[in-house]
A protein has these predicted regions:
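Long C-terminal extensions of eukaryotic subunits of large macromolecular complexes
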Residues: 217-277
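Structural signature of tandem alpha-helical TPR/SEL1-like repeats
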Residues: 2-3, 31-45, 71-82, 105-115, ...
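Canonical positions in the second alpha-helix
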Residues: 7-8, 47-49, 85-86, 116-119, ...
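Extracytoplasmic and endomembrane cell-envelope/extracellular-matrix remodeling and assembly machinery
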Residues: 184-238, 242
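TPR/TPR-like (Sel1-like) alpha-helical repeat modules
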Residues: 118, 146-158, 168-176, 181-205
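Extended amphipathic alpha-helical coiled-coil/heptad-repeat regions
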Residues: 32-35, 48-52, 60-89, 94-107
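Short helix-capping/linker turns of helical repeat alpha-solenoids
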Residues: 10-15, 20, 27-28, 51-56, ...
Length: 277
């Protein structure tokens, strides 16, 4: 996967560069394998984003300064200044991160909610998922909480996967962690559908998920009650492109081998030994 990201990044692909910065910073491989962080590689792509004047690069710089990543000295105060800049430029991940800081450090719940709302309005599923929890626990607004979880799932991502898991519980007979929805009747069709969507995004113990899936047709095939479901399997909620990919995923190993053979990416640029600890 690193080879594929590097190949896309060499063409200026924004999402691939974002993934590489985070990957080289945290050292978490897609299969769960841990690697030693690669500060010089993370710094390379951080500087690329800054040179391109990307708003998201301000968030990467916040992360580097606040945590001492990518070869930067630990400087939380300066890091927070770049986080605020990213927030002002409308970066939803930055808005979400600052909302968490206002929550945990300052207990300023009103500012937290305003920031989460800003990120949610841009389709950031993690913010929708968190805002759903706020509506449910702080205000007891189950209708709005349910809608936010549903919206988060439509946009995919880890936030969408977590929302799908919660929705599975909402429509199960045993509500588990979602006991505030005790009055919601069990619905086996919806429960199974949300479970299928959660596995696609988050994976299982033996198969990795794909958080990049989105479900633009979710409202058509799996609308919230009282509307009836038209569920015909996960493909019915996906775009045609995602459905084709889900049914016949490409051979990533073969793609990576071809990229290396063509010299688009050099082997030494992607070789990364796992940590032994």
């Amino acid at each position: 996967m690193i080879t594929l990201y590097e190949a896309a990044a060499s063409k200026g692909h924004y999402q691939a560069i974002n993934n590489l910065y985070l990957l080289y910073t945290n050292g978490h491989g897609a299969s769960g394998t841990l690697y030693a962080p690669q500060p010089s590689r993370a710094r390379k792509w951080l500087h690329y984003g800054l040179d391109k004047n990307w708003a998201m690069a301000n968030y990467w710089l916040f992360d580097a300064l606040y945590e001492g990543n990518a070869g930067y000295r630990h400087n939380p105060k300066l890091g927070l200044a770049y986080l605020q800049k990213a927030v002002d430029l409308g970066v939803p991940l930055a808005q979400y991160e600052l909302a968490r800081i206002y929550d945990k450090r300052f207990k300023d719940y009103n500012t937290r909610e305003r920031l989460l709302d800003c990120a949610a309005r841009q389709g950031f599923s993690a913010a929708m998922n968190e805002l759903s929890r706020v509506k449910r626990i702080r205000y007891g607004n189950l209708k709005e909480s349910l809608q936010l979880m549903h919206n988060a799932l439509r946009y995919g991502g880890e936030g969408g996967g977590e929302a799908a898991l919660k929705l599975t519980m909402v429509y199960a007979k045993n509500k588990a962690l979602m006991d505030k929805f005790i009055a919601t009747p069990a619905d086996p069709v919806r429960e199974a559908a949300y479970a299928e969507l959660e596995k696609a995004l988050m994976g299982t113990g033996t198969k990795s998920g794909n958080p990049f899936y989105t479900f633009p047709r979710l409202d058509e095939v799996l609308p919230l009650p009282p509307a009836k479901t038209r569920w015909k399997g996960i493909y019915s909620a996906m775009s045609k492109e995602d459905a084709a990919f889900y049914q016949n995923p490409p051979d990533t190993a073969a793609l990576a081998a071809d990229i290396l053979k063509r010299g688009i990416v050099k082997k030494e640029e992607v070789y990364w030994t796992p940590r032994k600890d």
